[in-house]
Amino acid sequence: MEPERKRSGSTLKKGRKRRLIPSKVVGAAEATRSHWDLEEKQQPIAKKARLSTVLFAENCEVTHGQLCELLKYAVLGKSSFPKPSWCQLFHQNHLKNVVVFILQGLSQLHFYKFYLEFGFLRKAFKHKFRMPPPSSDFLADIIGLQKKQIIGNLPKAMEGSLPFASSKVSINLQKDPIIQKYGFKKVGLTRCLLTKEEMKTYHFPLQGFLDCENFVPTKCNGSVTDNSPLFGLDCEMCLTSKGRELTRISLVAEGGGCVMDELVKPDNKIVDYLTSFSGITKKILNPVTTKLKDVQRRLKILLPPDAVLVGHSLDLDLRALKMIHPYVIDTSLLYVREQGRRFKLKFLAKAILGKDIQCPDRLGHDATEDARTTLELARYFLKYGPKKIAELNLEALFSYQESQEPRNTAEGVQRLNTSVLECLDSVGQKLLFLTQEADASALSSSKNCQTIKCLSNKEVLEQARVEIPLFPFSIVQFSFEPFSPNLTQEMNKRIKIKWTEMSTVYAGPFNKNCNLSALKRLFKSFGPVQLMTLVLETHQPHLCIQYEVLEAAQLAIESLDGVLVEGSCIKVQRPVTELTLDCDTLVNELEQDSENRGTIYLSGVSETFKEHLLQHCSIFLGLEAMILPKDLKSGKQKGYCFLRFKTFGSAQRALNILTGKDWKLRGRHALTPRHLHAWLRGLARESRLPGVRVIPPPSEQEAWQMLNVDHPKIAAWHWGRKIEKLYHNLCPGTLCLILLPGTKSTHGSLSGLGLMGIKDEEESTIPQTCVCESAHHLPGVIS
């Protein structure tokens, strides 16, 4: 590879590259894009196409439209299309071919259920990402084919105040998540209240919780009935040196009148007014003298004993207020969606009430308007009932609205409407589509597409070996029979339980006079603790610690098992169940996962860690990115992080330094890919009583006894090997995507999974460290 001449007057020694250190720590998006720009400017001219190791995707999820962005860019390059918003493809003109393998009927759940069986896929592709559940035509979505208008009066629905748009669409109301939760009949106010268990699940402030010790109760402890008064609440926050703090509160009574609208001056120094969201500026807040304690005192006076607070993501508002209230209706959970997703308030306001809020031409959100809107949404739900809401088919409305969102320019609209097929046609090329006879897709009947329909997956495989080398762009679709709803539900449950048990350790025995506070500090030093309980069923006390991340549990085992603690030689181990019997093997394979090979986990990091690390980054060669998760509620940085390095060797050297006598951190190699961590964080944790066995459904037991190729475990291994052989036959420089689209049916939806790489792509040095912070989860900006 020949070096590129430097544009500046300075020269570098042969074989050396100038390391650029950012003058300040920047946010994830800015760091990612500056990283891309610098890399493209400073890297030598490459003879091979390659993907950036940094992926940036909100919630670690890549939409079907974003996939289409990449595929169109891969065909025509930046002269015709903007770069993809979520990844970077360098030297696109050196790309040889594009091949997309689709495993229809499989999902992210299947991949991690049979993780050990998909050996080649997890090792060969270091770029992995989540996908939302598929629409009725997944292929049309990722290719960018324009769908025919199939949903009755959808445009009118989005304009009207009472949208009956979906009445012409055949939908199964029985399987609608709103019907499953509330039933068909109208419900009273008390049925819409979040239970204490739900409030715990969704991180509402509750009395007795350690993170709510300084929170103030509203003192509303009266008896709530269906006639209790509703109050809409919305708060705006800014970012201070201690995290997010309250800057405005709006409280609206049931009649629509605003009973409280106050600006609030935070106690700590403001570092970001978040004006685009809050509408608050330094000039607005300067004369304000009202403090948080004043607002708390007024709320306690204003709210009657049986007051019900209504809001959208109300947990965030209550945490900003540092108050505890027992009776809440959260409209983001009231209008329930599948897979734990939530509709935005702006969408619900338009779809349900026919009103526009949070308009882009207005500076920030209007807290009073938002509070009043949540109140109206709650009253609409109570007036019309769950059946009416389900009939609106909000998912279809949401999909339609997304597809109709305009781009900034006419050119943008034109690009949006261009499909991959049209891109290929413009350069005189055709797309190959291999599938089975039974598969129906708009793609198969499209012009400029060479469709070959086969009788079986085996025939698709045979045709792929012959046809792929003849086409610049190929889509190969294998179809698998979806699992039964019962089996899918059981698999989902077992995944949750297994991950909880893998992240849980039992430690002991301890002396009865041991220092419990010191023990808690010790085990918390390995990482964030979800739950810690004292086990007294044994002769001597033990501790049960459930960690938030798998790395923390593994680090505790490796550090303390067989060690003398508080005068006792303790054993630290996971619970032994049928789901953890292969835990050691799974942990080892996770560590070898291509996405984890160059990543390390560190615990005990302080808020100044990132600045300290950047000051000494010259000793951490190959450092590509930092992931610094923040607590969703407080906005404070958590006490752990992940560092991504170019090579395993660089990661190992850094780990030795950071866990040494100078830095004194605890750490190990990472185990959890970013997208997996985000997915698991979104699942409600499940646990079971010790000794309770999980019995596989009879259908799976029978299949296992038969040991034939149709068993899911064997099928996963079998087809993983087949795809491996196809991959090895691809020419170097081929962009290859493996897509497990997920499933969407009346029985429920499953998220998809994507794996991506360029065959024989050349590794490259990243000149700038990317700092990634997240208040919600570990962001999927690294792959």
Swiss-Prot record:
Enzyme class: hydrolase
UniProt domain RRM: residue ranges: 503-577, 598-677
Cross-referenced Pfam families: RNase_T, RRM_1
EC annotation from Swiss-Prot or TrEMBL: 3.1.-.-
Any one GO cellular component localisation term in the record: nucleus
Matching Gene3D superfamilies: 3.30.70.330, Ribonuclease H-like superfamily/Ribonuclease H
Entry keyword set: Exonuclease, Hydrolase, Nuclease, Repeat, RNA-binding
Superkingdom assignment: Eukaryota
Record-level Gene Ontology MF annotations: exonuclease activity; RNA binding
Matching CDD domains: REX1_like
Record-linked InterPro entries: Exonuclease_RNaseT/DNA_pol3, Nucleotide-bd_a/b_plait_sf, RBD_domain_sf, REX1-like_exo, REXO1/3/4-like, RNaseH-like_sf, RNaseH_sf, RRM_dom
All residue ranges annotated as the Exonuclease domain in the record: 230-378
GO biological process, one term: rRNA 3'-end processing
PANTHER family in the cross-refs: RNA EXONUCLEASE 5 (PTHR12801:SF82), RNA EXONUCLEASE REXO1 / RECO3 FAMILY MEMBER-RELATED (PTHR12801)
Protein known as: RNA exonuclease 5
Higher taxonomy: Eukaryota, Metazoa, Chordata, Craniata, Vertebrata
